[in-house]
Amino acid sequence: MNVAVTAVGGGVGQSIIKALQHTEYSTIGINSEVLGAGLYATRKSYIGPYANDPKYVDMMIKICRKEKCAAIFPGLDIELSPLSNNIKRFKNNDILPAVSDPTVIAICADKLKTCEFLQSNNFPSPRTFRLRDYSFELNFPITLKPQKGGHGSIGVLEVHDRREFDRYVASVDVNNYIVQECIEGDEYTCGTVTLEKRCVGTILMKRELRAGDTYKAFVVKDEKLSSFVRAIINALKPFGACNVQLRLRDNVPYIFEINARCSGTTASRALAGFNEPKIICDYVSKGITNPRFEIKEITILRYWKELAVSYDKIERMKSEGFIQNENIEL
Protein backbone atom coordinates (compact mmCIF):
# COMPACT_ATOMS: atom_id res chain seq x y z
CA MET A 1 0.00 0.00 0.00
CA ASN A 2 1.23 3.49 -0.85
CA VAL A 3 1.01 6.25 1.76
CA ALA A 4 1.48 10.00 1.25
CA VAL A 5 3.44 11.95 3.85
CA THR A 6 3.39 15.75 3.76
CA ALA A 7 5.83 18.38 5.04
CA VAL A 8 8.73 15.94 4.74
CA GLY A 9 11.21 18.78 5.15
CA GLY A 10 10.28 18.88 8.85
CA GLY A 11 10.81 16.62 11.83
CA VAL A 12 7.31 15.15 12.03
CA GLY A 13 7.11 14.20 8.34
CA GLN A 14 10.60 12.72 8.44
CA SER A 15 9.75 10.77 11.59
CA ILE A 16 6.73 9.22 9.86
CA ILE A 17 8.93 8.23 6.90
CA LYS A 18 11.48 6.60 9.22
CA ALA A 19 8.76 4.71 11.08
CA LEU A 20 7.48 3.20 7.81
CA GLN A 21 10.85 2.56 6.11
CA HIS A 22 11.13 -1.11 7.07
CA THR A 23 7.46 -2.00 6.75
CA GLU A 24 5.35 -3.23 3.85
CA TYR A 25 4.12 0.33 3.25
CA SER A 26 5.71 2.60 0.66
CA THR A 27 5.88 6.35 1.28
CA ILE A 28 5.30 9.16 -1.21
CA GLY A 29 6.88 12.40 0.02
CA ILE A 30 5.34 15.86 -0.45
CA ASN A 31 6.94 19.16 0.52
CA SER A 32 6.55 22.80 -0.48
CA GLU A 33 10.29 23.57 -0.49
CA VAL A 34 12.77 21.83 -2.78
CA LEU A 35 15.41 21.32 -0.08
CA GLY A 36 13.26 19.22 2.25
CA ALA A 37 15.38 16.20 3.21
CA GLY A 38 12.44 13.80 3.15
CA LEU A 39 11.89 14.46 -0.57
CA TYR A 40 15.08 12.53 -1.27
CA ALA A 41 14.33 9.57 0.99
CA THR A 42 10.95 8.35 -0.28
CA ARG A 43 10.24 6.19 -3.31
CA LYS A 44 8.62 9.09 -5.15
CA SER A 45 8.44 12.74 -4.16
CA TYR A 46 6.48 15.82 -5.20
CA ILE A 47 6.63 19.55 -4.65
CA GLY A 48 3.22 20.57 -3.33
CA PRO A 49 1.50 23.84 -2.39
CA TYR A 50 1.47 25.41 1.05
CA ALA A 51 -1.47 24.49 3.27
CA ASN A 52 -3.00 27.98 2.92
CA ASP A 53 -3.02 27.75 -0.88
CA PRO A 54 -6.59 27.39 -2.28
CA LYS A 55 -5.30 24.53 -4.46
CA TYR A 56 -3.82 22.59 -1.52
CA VAL A 57 -6.59 20.01 -1.09
CA ASP A 58 -7.05 19.49 -4.84
CA MET A 59 -3.31 18.90 -5.26
CA MET A 60 -3.13 16.44 -2.34
CA ILE A 61 -6.00 14.45 -3.82
CA LYS A 62 -4.42 14.57 -7.29
CA ILE A 63 -1.07 13.25 -6.02
CA CYS A 64 -2.72 10.55 -3.91
CA ARG A 65 -4.88 9.38 -6.81
CA LYS A 66 -1.92 9.32 -9.19
CA GLU A 67 0.20 7.27 -6.77
CA LYS A 68 -2.73 5.16 -5.50
CA CYS A 69 -2.15 6.29 -1.91
CA ALA A 70 -4.75 4.85 0.46
CA ALA A 71 -3.81 7.25 3.28
CA ILE A 72 -2.20 10.63 3.79
CA PHE A 73 -0.27 11.67 6.92
CA PRO A 74 0.17 15.40 7.66
CA GLY A 75 3.52 16.65 8.94
CA LEU A 76 2.53 20.19 9.94
CA ASP A 77 -0.14 21.55 12.28
CA ILE A 78 -1.27 24.07 9.67
CA GLU A 79 -2.29 21.18 7.39
CA LEU A 80 -4.63 19.59 9.92
CA SER A 81 -7.63 21.88 9.36
CA PRO A 82 -7.74 21.75 5.53
CA LEU A 83 -7.39 17.97 5.62
CA SER A 84 -9.92 17.57 8.43
CA ASN A 85 -12.45 19.89 6.81
CA ASN A 86 -12.26 17.82 3.62
CA ILE A 87 -12.24 14.27 5.03
CA LYS A 88 -15.35 13.41 3.01
CA ARG A 89 -13.73 14.54 -0.26
CA PHE A 90 -10.68 12.41 0.41
CA LYS A 91 -12.76 9.38 1.38
CA ASN A 92 -14.82 9.79 -1.81
CA ASN A 93 -11.50 9.30 -3.63
CA ASP A 94 -10.59 6.22 -1.54
CA ILE A 95 -8.02 8.15 0.52
CA LEU A 96 -8.11 8.25 4.32
CA PRO A 97 -6.52 11.33 5.89
CA ALA A 98 -4.85 10.39 9.20
CA VAL A 99 -6.50 13.34 10.96
CA SER A 100 -9.23 13.89 13.52
CA ASP A 101 -12.53 15.67 12.94
CA PRO A 102 -12.62 19.49 13.03
CA THR A 103 -13.92 19.64 16.62
CA VAL A 104 -10.89 17.74 17.94
CA ILE A 105 -8.52 19.79 15.78
CA ALA A 106 -9.99 23.01 17.20
CA ILE A 107 -9.51 21.84 20.81
CA CYS A 108 -5.90 20.79 20.27
CA ALA A 109 -4.91 23.82 18.19
CA ASP A 110 -5.93 26.25 20.93
CA LYS A 111 -4.14 25.87 24.28
CA LEU A 112 -6.93 27.65 26.14
CA LYS A 113 -9.54 25.32 24.64
CA THR A 114 -7.30 22.38 25.53
CA CYS A 115 -7.31 23.46 29.19
CA GLU A 116 -11.07 24.03 29.12
CA PHE A 117 -11.59 20.53 27.68
CA LEU A 118 -9.38 19.00 30.38
CA GLN A 119 -11.11 20.91 33.17
CA SER A 120 -14.59 20.01 31.91
CA ASN A 121 -13.58 16.35 32.01
CA ASN A 122 -11.93 16.64 35.45
CA PHE A 123 -8.35 16.09 34.26
CA PRO A 124 -5.55 18.08 35.95
CA SER A 125 -4.07 20.91 33.93
CA PRO A 126 -2.10 24.05 34.79
CA ARG A 127 -4.15 27.09 35.77
CA THR A 128 -4.45 29.13 32.58
CA PHE A 129 -5.60 32.66 31.73
CA ARG A 130 -5.86 34.84 28.64
CA LEU A 131 -3.02 37.31 28.78
CA ARG A 132 -5.32 40.23 28.03
CA ASP A 133 -7.47 39.32 31.06
CA TYR A 134 -4.69 38.36 33.45
CA SER A 135 -4.71 40.05 36.89
CA PHE A 136 -1.74 38.32 38.56
CA GLU A 137 -3.71 35.42 39.99
CA LEU A 138 -0.56 33.23 39.95
CA ASN A 139 2.69 33.40 41.86
CA PHE A 140 5.89 33.78 39.86
CA PRO A 141 7.40 32.05 37.99
CA ILE A 142 4.75 31.86 35.29
CA THR A 143 4.79 30.86 31.64
CA LEU A 144 3.68 32.95 28.66
CA LYS A 145 2.95 31.05 25.45
CA PRO A 146 1.00 31.50 22.21
CA GLN A 147 -2.64 30.47 22.50
CA LYS A 148 -2.64 29.31 18.88
CA GLY A 149 0.08 28.57 16.38
CA GLY A 150 3.01 27.86 18.67
CA HIS A 151 5.08 24.70 18.38
CA GLY A 152 8.06 23.38 20.29
CA SER A 153 9.37 26.13 22.54
CA ILE A 154 8.90 28.92 19.97
CA GLY A 155 7.36 31.94 21.66
CA VAL A 156 7.31 30.30 25.11
CA LEU A 157 8.62 32.58 27.85
CA GLU A 158 9.28 31.81 31.50
CA VAL A 159 8.69 34.92 33.59
CA HIS A 160 10.20 35.34 37.06
CA ASP A 161 9.01 38.77 38.23
CA ARG A 162 6.80 41.75 37.39
CA ARG A 163 9.60 43.58 35.62
CA GLU A 164 10.17 40.67 33.23
CA PHE A 165 6.42 40.34 32.78
CA ASP A 166 6.00 43.95 31.69
CA ARG A 167 8.95 43.69 29.30
CA TYR A 168 7.71 40.49 27.65
CA VAL A 169 4.09 41.62 27.41
CA ALA A 170 5.20 44.67 25.45
CA SER A 171 6.77 42.40 22.83
CA VAL A 172 3.95 39.89 22.18
CA ASP A 173 0.42 39.87 20.78
CA VAL A 174 -1.69 39.99 23.94
CA ASN A 175 -4.70 38.69 22.00
CA ASN A 176 -2.90 35.45 21.13
CA TYR A 177 -1.07 34.72 24.36
CA ILE A 178 -1.97 32.88 27.53
CA VAL A 179 -0.52 32.92 31.02
CA GLN A 180 0.00 29.50 32.53
CA GLU A 181 1.02 28.15 35.90
CA CYS A 182 4.55 26.70 35.87
CA ILE A 183 4.53 22.99 36.68
CA GLU A 184 7.88 21.71 37.87
CA GLY A 185 8.64 18.01 37.46
CA ASP A 186 9.58 15.29 34.99
CA GLU A 187 8.20 15.89 31.50
CA TYR A 188 6.61 13.12 29.45
CA THR A 189 5.58 12.86 25.83
CA CYS A 190 2.90 10.21 25.44
CA GLY A 191 1.97 8.65 22.11
CA THR A 192 -1.47 7.20 21.47
CA VAL A 193 -3.44 5.68 18.60
CA THR A 194 -7.22 5.77 18.40
CA LEU A 195 -9.26 3.68 15.97
CA GLU A 196 -13.04 3.83 15.73
CA LYS A 197 -13.31 6.17 18.74
CA ARG A 198 -11.29 3.85 21.03
CA CYS A 199 -7.71 4.29 22.22
CA VAL A 200 -5.94 1.08 21.19
CA GLY A 201 -2.45 1.82 22.50
CA THR A 202 -0.22 4.19 24.43
CA ILE A 203 3.49 4.69 24.96
CA LEU A 204 5.14 6.82 27.65
CA MET A 205 8.49 8.54 27.20
CA LYS A 206 10.15 10.67 29.85
CA ARG A 207 12.16 13.24 27.96
CA GLU A 208 14.88 15.83 28.11
CA LEU A 209 14.56 18.85 25.84
CA ARG A 210 16.99 20.96 23.87
CA ALA A 211 15.62 24.04 22.07
CA GLY A 212 12.11 22.68 22.56
CA ASP A 213 12.74 19.29 20.94
CA THR A 214 13.24 15.90 22.56
CA TYR A 215 16.89 14.88 22.37
CA LYS A 216 16.95 12.18 25.07
CA ALA A 217 13.95 9.95 25.74
CA PHE A 218 13.42 7.14 28.20
CA VAL A 219 10.61 4.69 27.48
CA VAL A 220 8.84 3.70 30.69
CA LYS A 221 6.05 1.32 31.61
CA ASP A 222 3.60 2.79 34.10
CA GLU A 223 0.11 1.32 33.96
CA LYS A 224 -1.41 4.01 36.17
CA LEU A 225 -0.10 6.81 33.95
CA SER A 226 -1.00 4.87 30.78
CA SER A 227 -4.58 4.47 32.03
CA PHE A 228 -4.72 8.19 32.76
CA VAL A 229 -3.57 9.09 29.24
CA ARG A 230 -5.96 6.54 27.74
CA ALA A 231 -8.87 8.10 29.66
CA ILE A 232 -8.04 11.54 28.23
CA ILE A 233 -7.90 10.19 24.69
CA ASN A 234 -11.14 8.23 25.07
CA ALA A 235 -12.81 11.45 26.22
CA LEU A 236 -11.36 13.46 23.32
CA LYS A 237 -12.07 10.80 20.66
CA PRO A 238 -9.49 11.74 18.01
CA PHE A 239 -8.58 9.54 15.06
CA GLY A 240 -5.15 8.03 14.57
CA ALA A 241 -2.09 9.37 16.33
CA CYS A 242 -2.46 11.88 19.16
CA ASN A 243 0.37 13.16 21.34
CA VAL A 244 -0.14 14.16 24.99
CA GLN A 245 2.49 16.25 26.79
CA LEU A 246 2.47 16.40 30.56
CA ARG A 247 4.53 16.94 33.69
CA LEU A 248 4.39 15.01 36.94
CA ARG A 249 4.21 17.10 40.11
CA ASP A 250 3.81 15.17 43.37
CA ASN A 251 2.82 12.15 41.26
CA VAL A 252 -0.06 14.09 39.70
CA PRO A 253 0.08 14.39 35.88
CA TYR A 254 -0.67 17.88 34.57
CA ILE A 255 -1.38 18.03 30.84
CA PHE A 256 -0.24 21.19 29.11
CA GLU A 257 -0.53 20.27 25.43
CA ILE A 258 -2.26 17.80 23.12
CA ASN A 259 -1.21 17.45 19.46
CA ALA A 260 -3.74 15.73 17.20
CA ARG A 261 -1.11 14.26 14.88
CA CYS A 262 2.05 12.21 14.76
CA SER A 263 5.07 13.58 16.60
CA GLY A 264 8.71 14.30 15.98
CA THR A 265 9.34 11.29 18.24
CA THR A 266 7.16 8.94 16.15
CA ALA A 267 10.24 7.13 14.80
CA SER A 268 11.66 6.84 18.33
CA ARG A 269 8.44 5.20 19.47
CA ALA A 270 8.63 2.77 16.56
CA LEU A 271 12.10 1.74 17.75
CA ALA A 272 10.54 0.99 21.13
CA GLY A 273 7.88 -1.25 19.56
CA PHE A 274 4.98 1.20 19.19
CA ASN A 275 4.75 2.16 15.52
CA GLU A 276 1.86 4.60 15.23
CA PRO A 277 1.90 5.07 11.41
CA LYS A 278 2.07 1.29 10.87
CA ILE A 279 -0.83 0.68 13.25
CA ILE A 280 -2.89 3.21 11.29
CA CYS A 281 -1.83 1.73 7.93
CA ASP A 282 -2.71 -1.78 9.15
CA TYR A 283 -6.16 -0.45 10.00
CA VAL A 284 -6.56 1.13 6.56
CA SER A 285 -5.27 -1.83 4.55
CA LYS A 286 -6.34 -4.79 6.71
CA GLY A 287 -9.05 -3.47 9.00
CA ILE A 288 -7.05 -4.34 12.14
CA THR A 289 -8.70 -2.60 15.12
CA ASN A 290 -6.88 -4.46 17.92
CA PRO A 291 -3.18 -4.10 17.06
CA ARG A 292 -0.55 -6.16 18.82
CA PHE A 293 2.67 -4.57 19.97
CA GLU A 294 5.31 -5.06 22.65
CA ILE A 295 6.84 -1.92 24.11
CA LYS A 296 10.50 -2.09 25.12
CA GLU A 297 11.89 0.01 27.96
CA ILE A 298 14.85 1.59 26.21
CA THR A 299 16.75 4.87 26.03
CA ILE A 300 16.52 6.87 22.80
CA LEU A 301 19.41 9.23 21.99
CA ARG A 302 18.62 11.54 19.07
CA TYR A 303 21.22 13.10 16.80
CA TRP A 304 21.71 14.82 13.46
CA LYS A 305 22.23 12.70 10.37
CA GLU A 306 23.47 13.95 6.99
CA LEU A 307 21.82 13.18 3.65
CA ALA A 308 23.92 13.83 0.55
CA VAL A 309 21.89 14.80 -2.52
CA SER A 310 23.33 15.51 -5.96
CA TYR A 311 22.87 18.96 -7.51
CA ASP A 312 21.38 17.23 -10.53
CA LYS A 313 18.61 15.65 -8.47
CA ILE A 314 17.78 18.96 -6.80
CA GLU A 315 17.66 20.73 -10.17
CA ARG A 316 15.30 18.05 -11.50
CA MET A 317 13.06 18.54 -8.51
CA LYS A 318 13.07 22.31 -9.12
CA SER A 319 12.22 22.01 -12.79
CA GLU A 320 9.85 19.03 -12.77
CA GLY A 321 8.38 19.10 -9.25
CA PHE A 322 8.80 15.33 -9.07
CA ILE A 323 11.56 12.74 -8.67
CA GLN A 324 12.01 9.04 -8.00
CA ASN A 325 14.55 7.72 -5.49
CA GLU A 326 16.18 4.36 -4.96
CA ASN A 327 17.62 2.77 -1.82
CA ILE A 328 17.92 5.96 0.23
CA GLU A 329 16.95 6.08 3.90
CA LEU A 330 16.72 8.79 6.50
Which ranges hold each PLM region?
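Conserved metal-phosphate-binding beta-hairpin within the catalytic cores
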Residues: 234-271
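ATP-binding N-terminal substructure of ATP-dependent carboxylate-amine bond-forming enzymes
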Residues: 1-98
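ATP-dependent carboxylate-activation loops
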Residues: 218-219, 263-279
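Peripheral (often C-terminal) accessory segments that flank ATP-dependent C-N-forming ligase machineries
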Residues: 278-330
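Active-site nucleotide/adenylate-binding loops and adjacent lid/helix of ATP-dependent enzymes
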Residues: 104-184, 194-198, 223-226
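Phosphate-binding site of ATP-dependent enzymes
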Residues: 159-237, 247-248, 252-254
